[in-house]
Amino acid sequence: MLNVFREINNNIIDDYNMYTASPNIASEREEIIQEGLAKLIVPRIELYRREDGSIEPAWMPVFYNPHAVVSRDLTVVFLKTTMNTRNFFYIDLLSGTGIRGIRIGLEVGGYGLLNDVDPRAYYYIKRNISLNKLEERLEAYNQEANTLLNMLVFSGIFVDYIDVDPYGSPVPFIDSVFKPLAKRAFIGISATDLAPLSCTHPHKTLVRYWDRCIKVDFSKEYALRLLLANIALRSAALGFSITPFLSMVHRHYVRVFLEVERSYSRAYKQISGCLGYIWYCPDTLERGYTREAIDVPSCSSGKKPVVFGKIWICNTTIPEIAEKALREVNTMNFLNPDTIKILALLKNEAEINTLYVRLDKLCGVLKINMPKINTLITKLREKGFKATRTHMDIRGIKTTAPLEELKEILLKSS
């Protein structure tokens, strides 16, 4: 399978001396780090610190973000959970240093194509594949992402998993990513443009993601559901349906793992059932889902709610997948502790398909001090409601309790 790409790739000059005379030795401006089971040559991280001490990956000659380790951990856990064979074919579309694709190869298996349009990234990928002794199963590639995906359509090779992890929005790649997939396959997509996704820049939200948004207290969940809606609409137009298996918001990015099936009928059912609207009362913080924009209740204040969408209104994570993934991490002692914490919360959240509530905002409306979140969750559960913290916001909870019930408990606790 990889021989097809090796023949095409021979047109690219294979000259390791561009960076170093010895491909497995880091130069003075590089270092070798370990993430998961992988060793990696990367630009020396300390050279790219801001004045406030934070790392700025965009300054590096080849992009490597140490803060995205949870995203890469979850990629490995997700594939170990869903792939029934080690003999699958995957593409790391925007590979940078190659870390995600190399970790998949080492920690899960499969045959991979690690691609980046930047020639400098291509050489890093080549070196890191060699450093991890994966030459037999992984191939570095140097091509514009959409061009590569469209080439695959005519190659007769079907892909089982494609990972899209851009710097910014994934929108330029979404339409192309479905075309070379097998009849049933998986994709992992990241979006780091949280500002438009969470309505910080409403004009960009409209142009890029097709929604006239407003500021809400559940902005991170709005970002997640808006991204899913956009992917669902684009995939349905091409005859594909998506099912979110795992979805999260962490630090600066949204990350979704989706099952994809080639079926117009399933795509129709999905668009009909899972795309709808959110109604929201800014003064009282009441909110909810509706399939039709005209089918909304009035706010308790007597005002009309704001309605926006289209938005994804079905589950964003399958409870059984989160539970299975959580069991899988017990066999992987090299994962970041935050990954395990997020998976545990995802498992609880997956059973509650409501928008999270920012307790500090709600307590501000009620003019009371915010109680301890764990105490509040216990009281909600004692009343028979499901309730949990959310991984998306440390001040937020998800619960099946109506907002009026939540307010009543808060007022009694104040």
Residue positions per predicted region:
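SAM-dependent transferase fold signal centered on methyltransferase-like domains
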Residues: 1-414
